[in-house]
């Protein structure tokens, strides 16, 4: 579709980090080495379908992101679960800011920061603690990841491996058909 060549796969590559339930179809495609080409293709694919966006940020980025979003009048909710567990959730994205959100999604994903776009109907998002050994928890602190529960006619999109792989997990929302 568009410039991307999607392949249907059986499971999400890293299911421990990308926790998505009620999935009927999963598609993947390799992204290009060209930032503008990827952003343009993402915009063509998802511009009319974006519903929600969630991004994980470092504590040092929280204030700047808040200021930037406030200047654009984009509403958001912040979940600050301590240390490195800060999530911005956007439940309503103005159509005028969809391009900005797509660029942010791609930009933070290629830096190995966690971000997900939801498409179609609203999905249920809960933050879930990853179980680690007490020793690892003392070293790195608690770690939370969003758990996404899809509903019919919804999907979520994320980029893995420092911007190399685009994954779409859907529930009867066929956006990859050619």
Regions found by a protein language model. Give the residues of each.
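Structured alpha/beta or helical-core interaction and ligand-binding surfaces enriched in interleaved
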Residues: 1-165, 169-178
């Amino acid at each position: 579709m568009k410039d991307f060549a999607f392949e249907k796969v059986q499971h999400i590559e890293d299911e421990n980090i990308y926790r998505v339930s009620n999935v009927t179809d999963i598609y993947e495609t390799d992204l290009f080495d060209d930032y503008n080409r990827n952003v343009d293709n993402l915009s063509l694919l998802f511009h009319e379908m974006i519903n929600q966006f969630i991004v994980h940020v470092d504590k040092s980025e929280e204030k700047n992101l808040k200021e930037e979003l406030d200047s654009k009048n984009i509403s958001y909710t912040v979940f600050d679960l301590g240390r490195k567990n800060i999530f911005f959730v956007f439940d309503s994205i103005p159509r005028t800011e969809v391009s900005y959100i797509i660029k942010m999604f791609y930009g933070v994903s290629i830096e190995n920061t966690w971000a997900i776009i939801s498409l179609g109907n609203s999905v249920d998002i809960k933050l879930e603690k990853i179980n680690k050994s007490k020793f690892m928890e003392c070293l790195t602190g608690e770690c939370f990841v969003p758990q996404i529960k899809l509903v019919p006619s919804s999907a979520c999109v994320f980029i893995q491996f420092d911007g190399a792989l685009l994954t779409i997990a859907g529930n009867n929302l066929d956006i990859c058909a050619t």
